[in-house]
Amino acid sequence: MWFLILFLALSLGQIDAAPPGQSRVVGGYNCETNSQPWQVAVIGTTFCGGVLIDPSWVITAAHCYSKNYRVLLGRNNLVKDEPFAQRRLVSQSFQHPDYIPVFMRNHTRQRAYDHNNDLMLLHLSKPADITGGVKVIDLPTEEPKVGSICLASGWGMTNPSEMKLSHDLQCVNIHLLSNEKCIETYKNIETDVTLCAGEMDGGKDTCTGDSGGPLICDGVLQGLTSGGATPCAKPKTPAIYAKLIKFTSWIKKVMKENP
């Protein structure tokens, strides 16, 4: 599981953290300004990414659960004043019912179970204003194709030796890999509800602070960052993402029942 404990209040003037797990963009680049308008920052007891799928709804990783959240939208840089920046509180959160939190796990289970059904919906206390820098992205309608070039994004650490978030939103281009590649690394992963993406040669990855952020393959939102190996970007150790096509019915049901 990849998540990041904040050492600061929401001033965001200085962002340092110590990760109990791992999830950041490594080997990436500064995203083009406003190119990822659905990307949000989710701040609770941990720092995570998230995705705006409706003006009132954000989807993120279940392991990013907190009692309270603040959501930053329209951000490219976490510390600068930006014209499209918005801030929202969260009125309700809904972890997937089949996600098993760490504190409830049977200790005989292997770590890969952390990543199964790892998604959560956040109901914003006030709908986001849709602008040039804040937009929703549609849920997938078809299975992603192995070999697709995918884009992951987030403000997670870019250097595993520095416990510090990136101020600028980072993007990284990686390949969607086969289930077999995932099973080689994570023996008990449930590949029907997860995706594996990365570079088998290493060097490019998501990592600490990126959990819950988007994985967009061939222009379609297909996954949410869940976790991976430590340190990030190791050869032959792709990262794990929640496979959203398997959860669209649950997502729509929760949104409909909680207008």
UniProtKB/Swiss-Prot annotation:
The active site is at H63, D118, S211. CDD domains: Tryp_SPc. One of its GO terms (cellular component) is extracellular space. It catalyses: Preferential cleavage of Arg-|-Xaa bonds in small molecule substrates. Highly selective action to release kallidin (lysyl-bradykinin) from kininogen involves hydrolysis of Met-|-Xaa or Leu-|-Xaa. Residues 19-24 form a propeptide. One of its GO terms (molecular function) is serine-type endopeptidase activity. It comes from the Eukaryota. Glycans are attached at N106. Keywords: Disulfide bond, Glycoprotein, Hydrolase, Protease, Serine protease, Signal, Zymogen. Residues 1-18 form the signal peptide. Pfam families: Trypsin. Transmembrane segments: none annotated. Disulfide bonds join C31-C171, C48-C64, C150-C217, C182-C196, C207-C232. Its EC number is 3.4.21.35. Coiled coil: none annotated. Glandular kallikreins cleave Met-Lys and Arg-Ser bonds in kininogen to release Lys-bradykinin. This enzyme has a vasoconstrictor activity. KLK-9 has both a chymotrypsin-like and a trypsin-like properties. Heterodimer of a light chain and heavy chain linked by a disulfide bond. Belongs to the peptidase S1 family. Kallikrein subfamily. This is Submandibular glandular kallikrein-9. The lineage of its organism: Eukaryota, Metazoa, Chordata, Craniata, Vertebrata. The gene is Klk9.
